[in-house]
């Protein structure tokens, strides 16, 4: 039969999970329609998990990319370097290699712990045969602010390339060195390569991890706000961007009324007349950074990141459907493998005449 979709899977529940309060959540395939061989895209799957159908495959927003094998399920063995400390890290190659070693050891531990465990055979086989690890980063936006670089300007793009080319360089050295000492991953050995790990880099969202790391920025995205109220299990506290606070202090403007105005403007500093243009650009919030700048930086990094990036974007209220299409098309043209989350604009004040998604700080391309 020439069919698209899982015709035998009707009524099957997918993504079924049991939560700590013993509640159950799942998505169920209600109906399937055969349409022959033509491409089919249905983004109307009834789910709060952003699932949709693409050529019969139940699809979701994608965090990272690995090759698909019928008899293996990819294993996520990942960690991240905190780029707030990049100046120390870049001059210490062994630190980067140790991070890769840490992940390879975790993969080995996973192999040992899953031996004989029911339903883990496919994942264990992937860990044995591919030994994929993913070293990424967090704190990129904070690093830019520490150095006074605006998101997407020439300086930020230069250090962005330096970061990921350096991590890739020492990651390649590590996986080849350890491959010679301890043996290559079987899938690499079959291909005639000396590599301990088939893949070595990916950039996760790192939202929770970045907060634990002294509330630094996430994987690739700018700060959502320069000031916000953070609610934890037992406490609430007000976060103020420490680098902005330092700048305000140097200008004698680190005052309660200034912070009140920042709060009233959804964490933005664009209304502060005593800041110059460069300073305002440095402390732009996520919704104030044009998608083009974020995509360009991610594209520069993608050349070195084999498993992809969790790339989030903000779509402003004044963007049309054509704008959103052009953003996705531009990301594809810039070799971005996937996009992760789409956030709505933080405030309507960004609906400025003449300001479009491809407005950028430094349009070098």
Predicted feature residues:
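HINT superfamily self-processing domains
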Residues: 1-61
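Hydrophobic, well-ordered secondary-structure elements that form the walls
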Residues: 15, 43, 78, 140, ...
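Catalytic alpha/beta core of large soluble enzyme barrels
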Residues: 33, 107-109, 113-115, 201-365
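Structured core elements
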Residues: 39-44, 52, 77, 82, ...
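Short helix/loop capping segments that flank catalytic or ligand/cofactor-binding pockets
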Residues: 49-55, 60-61, 73, 86-87, ...
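Function-dense linear segments that define catalytic or interfacial modules
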Residues: 62-127, 137-143, 147, 216-217, ...
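Conserved active-site and cofactor/substrate-binding residues in soluble primary-metabolism enzymes
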Residues: 73-76, 90-101, 128-138, 158, ...
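Internal maturation/activation junctions in enzymes
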Residues: 96-124, 128, 132, 147-206, ...
